[in-house]
From Swiss-Prot:
This is Zinc finger and BTB domain-containing protein 16-A. Residues 270-279 have a biased composition (Basic and acidic residues). Gene3D superfamilies: Classic Zinc Finger, Potassium Channel Kv1.1, Chain A. It is found in: Nucleus; Cytoplasm. It comes from Danio rerio (Zebrafish). CDD domains: BTB_POZ_ZBTB16_PLZF. The gene is zbtb16a. GO terms for molecular function: DNA-binding transcription repressor activity, RNA polymerase II-specific; RNA polymerase II cis-regulatory region sequence-specific DNA binding; zinc ion binding.
C-alpha cells in the first residue's frame, strides 16, 4: 500500500484533552510553572493564568494587568478551591448547601457552564419542593415547624441572566414593585441602569419610591391609618401581594393554591390580560430558580392584630420572596414571557430596610461598560444598602444614631458620618493611579479595572508614566517643562507650592537649625519640628508608652506608627495586586510598579529607576562613583552629610551665589 498517494493524513489523540488537564492539575498541585497567585481571605492559591483565563471570562479581563498577585473578596477559600478543581479537572464535589455560593461565584467569574449546571440542579430542587408543598396542602395536613422553616429557606427565589445571549438588566427594586396600572412593561422597555426620564421603567421606579415611603411611614407610625382598609386608594394591590409561604405561616392555616389563583385571576382582570396569558403548570422557567439554599426566618409580631401593620412590616420581604409565577399572575405578565433580566432584592436586606427607598436608586453603574457582570454590580449594590440599614431594629427604634436626611439608623457615629457622605456627594475614595475620586469603595474598585483593560498604554518619554489617552499625556508633560514644572525636593521627593517653601525645607537636609525653643533654647531645623517639640512642655514629656519595648512618645500617632514594627501591621494595601505595606510612602512607591513610572534618572547614563534607593545603588555601578559630586572641584562624596562637610572646606568667595546643595546630585527626579 503506497501511503504517498493517499494525500493528507489526520492524526488524532482522543485522550489529549483529559491528559492535558490532568498534567496541568499535577503541575498546579506541585507548584510547577505557576505564574499567578490568587489571595482569598489571606489564603494563597497558586495556579496558571492560562487555565484560569480559559475557564473564566472575568479572569481573562483581570489578567491584562500582567500582575502576579490578585485578591478576591467576594467568595470563601472553600468555594475558590472548588472553582479551581472544576477548572483543572472539569468536575467538582459539593454539598447541596454549597450550590448557592458556587452559583454566586460562577456568576461573577462568568464561568457559564458551571453556572448552567448549578441552575439545573436548583431548578430540580425547586420543582420537587413545590410538588411536596402542593401535596401537603391538598391533604390538609399540618406541617411541623422545622419543615415549614426549611421550606421558607428553599423558597427564597431570585432570577438573573442565564443565557449566553446579550440581554439587558433591570434592578430588583424596579421589577419587584412594578405594580399593574402603573406601567405597561414590555420586552422593548430599556432595562439598563442608565434610565431615561421618560421611560416606562423610570415611571415604575418613581412609583416604587412612593410605595416605599408609605411603607416607611406605616412602619415608623403603626398607629396612623389603622382604620384605613387594606385595599385603599393609594396602593390597591399591596394587600394582595402575599407569597405562598406567607399564607402558610399566617394563623397556622394552610391555603390551597386555588386561593392564590383567585388572587391572580382578579389581578389579571384588573390589568386587562386574557386567561391564556396567566401561568399554568409546567417546569420552572430559567428566571425562576432558587438562588439561596440558606434558611430564612421571618420575624412576626404576634401583638399586631391589624392586617395593615403586618403588610407594612413584611411588604418588602414578601416581594423579595415571590416566584416568577406569582409575579406573572399578579402583574398580568404572559406565562411565555421569560424576562431574563428579572432580579430579586435579597430578603435578608429587605427585612431590615426601614430607610427611604429613594436611596436605592442613587447609584448609577451604567458607566462601567461591561468591566464587571451586571449581576455582580447589583449584588454589591444591595450589599451596600444592607450595610446602610445595619443596626436598625424591626420595630424601627434606633440602636444609636439616625441620619437626619433619610432617617437611616446606624450603630455608631463613624457609620453615620460615612453614610451622610452619600447625601453630600463627598468623594472620599481616591484612585492612587490617576487621582480621580469616588463616593464609595465599590465604585473605586470597579474604576481600578479601567487601568488594566488591555489597551495599549502611551508612555511619557521623560519619566515613563503610562496613560490611556493622548490628552492625559499632554497634561502630564507640563510638569516637565516651563513655569508649571513641579517644585519638589530632589532628595526626598516631597512636593511644595512655592520655591520659598522648598528652600526652607532644604535647610532640614543641610543641617541648618534656625528655629529656637523659647522654653529650653533647643534649636530645630523647621517650624514643624519646633511645634512638635513644644508639646513636651505643655502635655507632659513622653506620655505615650509602647507596651512591647517600653519606648515613650510625645503623641499617640507616633506611637501607633512605632507599634507596627512589633506587630507587623501593614494597613496600606495596593488595590491592584493586594500587597500590603507598613508606611504610606512605601505604597506610593509600589504603585509605580503598576504604572511603569520611573521618575529617577541617572545624569551619567540616563538610566531610570522607580525609587531613590535604587538610583543610589545604580550610581555606585559607575566605577564606584558616589551619588554626590562637588560642582567646584568635581570631587565625589558617598553621602549628603559628607558633601555638606566637604563644602565647608571651600572658601565662601569660591561658591557661586546661586549654588544649592541639590546641584551636587548625580540624578534627576521628575515627581
Amino acid at each position: 500500500m503506497d501511503l504517498t498517494k493517499m494525500g493528507m493524513i489526520q492524526l488524532q489523540n482522543p485522550n489529549h484533552p483529559n491528559a492535558l488537564l490532568h498534567k496541568a492539575n499535577q503541575m498546579r498541585l506541585a507548584g510547577t510553572l505557576c505564574d499567578v497567585v490568587i489571595m482569598v481571605d489571606s489564603q494563597e492559591f497558586h495556579a496558571h493564568r492560562t487555565v484560569l483565563a480559559c475557564t473564566s471570562k472575568m479572569f481573562e479581563i483581570l489578567f491584562h494587568r500582567n500582575s502576579q498577585h490578585y485578591t478576591l473578596d467576594f467568595l470563601s477559600p472553600k468555594t475558590f478551591q472548588q472553582i479551581l478543581e472544576y477548572a483543572y479537572t472539569a468536575t467538582l464535589q459539593a454539598k447541596v448547601e454549597d450550590l448557592d455560593d458556587l452559583l454566586y461565584a460562577a456568576e461573577i467569574l462568568e464561568i457559564e457552564y458551571l453556572e448552567e449546571q448549578c441552575l439545573k440542579i436548583l431548578e430540580t430542587i425547586q420543582s420537587s419542593d413545590e410538588n411536596d408543598t402542593e401535596v401537603n396542602m391538598n391533604d390538609g395536613g399540618t406541617e411541623d415547624d422545622e419543615e415549614r422553616k426549611g421550606r421558607h429557606g428553599r423558597n427564597l427565589v431570585g432570577s438573573k441572566k442565564h443565557s449566553t445571549e446579550e440581554s439587558g438588566y433591570v434592578s430588583a427594586a424596579q421589577q419587584a414593585l412594578a405594580l399593574p396600572g402603573m406601567v405597561d412593561q414590555s420586552p422593548s422597555v430599556s432595562t439598563s441602569f442608565g434610565l431615561s426620564t421618560m421611560s416606562p421603567t423610570k415611571a415604575a421606579v418613581d412609583s416604587l419610591m412612593s410605595i416605599g415611603q408609605s411603607l416607611l411611614q406605616s412602619t415608623m407610625h403603626p398607629g396612623v391609618g389603622a382604620e384605613q382598609p387594606l385595599h385603599g386608594n393609594s396602593h390597591p394591590m399591596m394587600g394582595e401581594i402575599k407569597t405562598e409561604m406567607m399564607q402558610v405561616d399566617e394563623s397556622g392555616e394552610h391555603e390551597s393554591p386555588k386561593a392564590m389563583e383567585s388572587i391572580a385571576s382578579s389581578n389579571g382582570e384588573r390589568s386587562g390580560e386574557p386567561d391564556k396569558n396567566r401561568d399554568g403548570p409546567g417546569t420552572p422557567t430559567r428566571s425562576s430558580v432558587i438562588t439561596s439554599a440558606r434558611e430564612l426566618h421571618y420575624v412576626r409580631d404576634e401583638g399586631l392584630g391589624d392586617q395593615q401593620a403586618e403588610v407594612s412590616q413584611m411588604g418588602l420581604e414578601a416581594m423579595a420572596g415571590m416566584t416568577e409565577k406569582h409575579l406573572a399572575s399578579l402583574y398580568g405578565i404572559p406565562s411565555n414571557h421569560k424576562n431574563e433580566a428579572m432580579l430579586s432584592m435579597p430578603a435578608s436586606m429587605a427585612s431590615s430596610l426601614h430607610m427611604s427607598p429613594a436611596l436605592a436608586m442613587s447609584m448609577d453603574f451604567s458607566a462601567y461598560g461591561g468591566l464587571l457582570p451586571q449581576s455582580f454590580i447589583q449584588r454589591e449594590f444591595f450589599s451596600k444598602l444592607g450595610e446602610l440599614a445595619a443596626g436598625i431594629k424591626p420595630d424601627g427604634r434606633s440602636l444609636n444614631e439616625r441620619c437626619n436626611v433619610c432617617g437611616a439608623e446606624l450603630p455608631d457615629n463613624e457609620a453615620i458620618e460615612q453614610h451622610r457622605k452619600l447625601h453630600s456627594g463627598m468623594k472620599t475614595y481616591g484612585c492612587e493611579l490617576c487621582g480621580k475620586r469616588f463616593l464609595d469603595s465599590l465604585r473605586l474598585r470597579m474604576h481600578l479595572l479601567s487601568h488594566s483593560a488591555g489597551e495599549k498604554a502611551i508612555v511619557c518619554d521623560q519619566c515613563g508614566a503610562q496613560f490611556q489617552k493622548e490628552d492625559a499625556l499632554e497634561a502630564h508633560r507640563q510638569i516637565h517643562t516651563g513655569s508649571d514644572m513641579a517644585i519638589f525636593c530632589l532628595l526626598c521627593g516631597k512636593r511644595f507650592q512655592t520655591q520659598t517653601a522648598l528652600q526652607q525645607h532644604m535647610e532640614v537636609h543641610a543641617g541648618v537649625r534656625s528655629y529656637i525653643c523659647s522654653e529650653c533654647n533647643r534649636t530645630f531645623p523647621s517650624h514643624t519640628a519646633l511645634k512638635r517639640h513644644l508639646r513636651s512642655h505643655t502635655a507632659g514629656d513622653h506620655p505615650f508608652e509602647c507596651e512591647f519595648c517600653g519606648s515613650c512618645f510625645r503623641d499617640e500617632s507616633t506611637l501607633k506608627g512605632h507599634k507596627r514594627i512589633h506587630t507587623g501591621e501593614k494597613p496600606y494595601e495596593c488595590n491592584g495586586c493586594g500587597k500590603k505595606f507598613s508606611l504610606k510612602h512605601q505604597l506610593e512607591t509600589h504603585y509605580r510598579v503598576h504604572t511603569g513610572e520611573k521618575p529617577f534618572e541617572c545624569k551619567l547614563c540616563h538610566q531610570r529607576s522607580r525609587d531613590y534607593s535604587a538610583m543610589i545603588k545604580h550610581l555606585r555601578t559607575h566605577n564606584g562613583a558616589s551619588p554626590y559630586q562637588c560642582t567646584i572641584c568635581l570631587e565625589y562624596c558617598p553621602s549628603l552629610s559628607a558633601m555638606q562637610k566637604h563644602m565647608k572646606g571651600h572658601k565662601p568667595e569660591d561658591i557661586p551665589p546661586d549654588w544649592r546643595i541639590e546641584k551636587t546630585y548625580l540624578y534627576l527626579c521628575y515627581v
